[in-house]
Amino acid sequence: MSPQTETKASVGFKAGVKEYKLTYYTPEYEVKDTDILAAFRVTPQPGVPPEEAGAAVAAESSTGTWTTVWTDGLTSLDRYKGRCYDIEPVPGEEDQYICYVAYPLDLFEEGSVTNMFTSIVGNVFGFKALRALRLEDLRVPTAYIKTFQGPPHGIQVERDKLNKYGRPLLGCTIKPKLGLSAKNYGRAVYECLRGGLDFTKDDENVNSQPFMRWRDRFLFCAEAIFKSQAETGEIKGHYLNATAGTCEEMIKRAMCARELGVPIVMHDYLTGGFTANTSLAHYCRDNGLLLHIHRAMHAVIDRQKNHGMHFRVLAKALRMSGGDHIHAGTVVGKLEGERDITLGFVDLLRDDVIEKDRSRGIYFTQDWVSMPGVLPVASGGIHVWHMPALTEIFGDDSVLQFGGGTLGHPWGNAPGAVANRVALEACVQARNEGRDLAREGNEIIREASKWSPELAAACEVWKAIKFEFDAVDKLDKPAS
């Protein structure tokens, strides 16, 4: 060790344990445009002050450890440490706080969602001084955004590829999700597409099982796509799930899809992992494939209000990692999703600049600097009676996906697809004529059903189906 290094390392070093807040709680800090900002919902253990809890989060997710180490003297901690710069109590909750942490950009590898999450939500979530910890939102600086490719194509390029404008796209998940042979699966795809849907979909756990190997499924689905395209004159697609046990196998499946000439593949991005997802997104852009993203496993991470990570963070991460569609809840169906919260992260997926809006759960203004947008997919327990609400809530730039709401039609798959297409066209026309979908939705569907026996049959089957459960994850009540 040189004398110069020895002197620097030894000056001011005192072994032992010191409070995190002495180093990592800096309320005077002015955040920089290049900082990654995080909003954490922190529930400290009894007796732990909020300043110490917030500082502990900043420390353990950046440069800190449980004790003072002499190697701190070999670098500039002030340059690299995370800082808890603001703390606010959560209204209506005892001993719970929103702690804001700023991270210098040098802590993160360029173009790596994996590295970003490893730092920010790594070991800190198991920290004993905290009863619970949840990452509510991130502000990703434009300097870091620019190191990512983002979605393979984005909303406008997808519409141009499909030649479909002025309405939401329609999809359907093939059911039963497991157990069909490849040929019967392809037949179900064909019936749905010829009936008027734009897409059909592999379910998230359809990979390559003994009853249906992936290559057989790809071949029969490609045949269904081309046959339905020839009959309808519309471009069709099926989300071929390329998720696999290894990245190499995943890319091999995507290559097969490209060689078959189909327009879109699919990935389970949380179970598959961000490294695999980013690799697939790059392949899709280079080879002209659209990429549909399923969020299987998200509720393990995001459903509990006090611990984990909010889906808006996972949605931002997906836009950076890459995907052209992602499942985003329905508000009206069988899966979790409160309206204001859902619309908040739907805008984060689609828009270029999203302003801070705590009434929708958005903690920071986010500028995507022209990164392509992602189409939100509404899927799960929806049927024709939901069509007006879905059209009003999600607007044109969305995919409305009816699985049971297509395949459960009493006359079969194709009539089920016809019913959904007629309902959608009726809602879009009514909206364009200035009618109020929220108020007149049922009347609009009834009027359309007079001219479509398929829609009339669907209306009769699902007239009493509702999912009246309260959302678990709700916005905080404002302080009175």
UniProtKB/Swiss-Prot annotation:
Regions crossing the membrane: none
Residues with PTM N6-carboxylysine: K201
EC numbers for this chain: 4.1.1.39
HAMAP family given in the database record: RuBisCO_L_type1
Gene Ontology annotations for the cellular component aspect, listed alphabetically: chloroplast
Annotated GO biological process: photorespiration; reductive pentose-phosphate cycle
Gene: rbcL
Broad EC category: lyase
Site, as annotated: Transition state stabilizer: K334
SUPFAM superfamilies named in the record: RuBisCo, C-terminal domain (SSF51649), RuBisCO, large subunit, small (N-terminal) domain (SSF54966)
Classification lineage: Eukaryota, Viridiplantae, Streptophyta, Embryophyta, Tracheophyta
Catalytic activity: 2 (2R)-3-phosphoglycerate + 2 H(+) = D-ribulose 1,5-bisphosphate + CO2 + H2O; D-ribulose 1,5-bisphosphate + O2 = 2-phosphoglycolate + (2R)-3-phosphoglycerate + 2 H(+)
Major location category of this protein: plastid
InterPro entries: RuBisCO (IPR033966), RuBisCo_large_chain_AS (IPR020878), RuBisCO_lsu_C (IPR000685), RuBisCO_lsu_C_sf (IPR036376), RuBisCO_lsu_fd_N (IPR017443), RuBisCO_lsu_N_sf (IPR036422), RuBisCO_lsuI (IPR020888)
The keyword Metal-binding is assigned to this record: yes
Protein name: Ribulose bisphosphate carboxylase large chain
Catalytic residues, chain numbering: K175 (proton acceptor), H294 (proton acceptor)
Family membership noted in the UniProt record: Belongs to the RuBisCO large chain family. Type I subfamily.
Binding site for Mg(2+): K201, D203, E204
